[in-house]
Each structure stands twice: as C-alpha cells, then as structure tokens.
Amino acid sequence: MFIIVGIIMLGLAGGIFFLTKYTATKDLETEIPSQLPIASISSFTQSCIERIAKEAVAQNGVQGGYFEPPPEYVEVANLKIPYFYDGKNDATPPSRTLQKELAKNVQRNLNNCLQDFSFIKDQGYTVETGPIQSDIIFGDSIFFDFTFPVTISAETTSKTIDTFSTRVNVNIPKIIDTYEQIIEQQKIKPNFVMVSYLNDLALEKEVRIELNYIDGDSVLYTIIDQDSLIDEHPYQFTFAIKYDWTKEGK
C-alpha cells in the first residue's frame, strides 16, 4: 500500500466518475415487474432499497460521510467535502453521525427508485406507504434494517409488507479508525503534511491514501479500501484538512 501525492484531483475525479457511472448503470438495471402479486411488489421494493443503499454509501463516502454537509466544507466539482481539521478544531464525525447521514440519504432518495409505485397504481391498485425507519450497523459490512410499511389494496383485499434489509460490503470502522489517526497525528504538527506517517498508516490499515492540493490552503485526503467493494469498485472516503502554509513545519 502507498501514498499518492498530486496537485491534480485525479483520485477524486475517479470517485466522481465511479459514482456517476454506477448510478446511471443502476438506472438501466432496475426493472418494473409486469405482474402485480405481493411477491413481485416485495421484490421490486427490495431491489430499490439495495440500489439506494449502495448509492448512499458511495455518495456519502466522497463527501466525508455526509449527505448534508456540516458548516465548514470546501466545494469541489459539485461535491461538498467537510473539513475534519483546520489547525485548531477537530471535526471528525463519530460513527453515529455517519449512520444518521446514510439514513437521511436513503430516506430522501428511495422514492426516486420506487416512483411512488405508479406502475401499480396505473393498474387500478391502491398503494399506501408509511414513514421509513432505519437501523444501520457498522461492522465488516454495513447492515441496513428498514421498517417501511407498504400496503397494497384492491377492492376489499389488502396486504402490508413492512420489513426489508440489505448489506453493503464496506468496512466503515476501518475507515473511521484511519481518519481519526490521521487527525490525531496532524494535531502534533498542524501545518505539516505527514507523508512518511501516512505511508506507514496506509501499510498498517491496508488502504491507499491519496492527497490532492486545492484552494491554496487545503488538502483533500482520500482513503481507498480495495477490500471494501461496491459492485467491484473500491470504496473511497474523502475529507479535507486546512493548513496555514506560512507556518509550515510548525
């Protein structure tokens, strides 16, 4: 494992390309079933949940784990990347924050895939949905458990399905431990980029760390985990650190 240092945001561009390509591909792959038994409705909803969960993990990853950015961030290529450290303040997000941000993303975007079940309603069925509640657990993978009531009715008959689950093969605790160690070490020399230390940390964590210099005083850090895959694409997690180069080395 190794560090790649560059002044052009190649690593970030790759992450954006993957996210765009992944989403476009999945748009084509989502199929609306032509038949309307409960099994088909359940399968369609499950496929949307799986797709949106993967997209949420990928999208939040290239924005430092956030769906809605914190107050301090830098905007790069339409992405709002949070500062985890600015020379004084430690703004590293705990796991519960990353879980909440994933839940926001899924809840906000799920209906983009479900399309309000219009293909069912067009057949004369009535569909009612309740609020989405999520339980997200971080381990070697991300485990999503959802309570999402979907009631399908026709004349005097109705049926409700309400529990769904999926997992995404991304090791978030490993990512959290990596960025927390980077920030703790950065506090020792707030205005010094610790290339040697980052090399050692990348080897220890079995990740790749890419640095991209932007905006004169900011550096983007991208942690790439080849063992955490979303449809065979390595997971990427990007955050920013702000430096005062007039005090470099201090």
What are these regions (language model features)?
Residues 5-250:
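Long, compositionally biased, intrinsically disordered regions
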Residues 1-2:
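N-terminal positive-inside, membrane-proximal cytosolic segments immediately preceding the first
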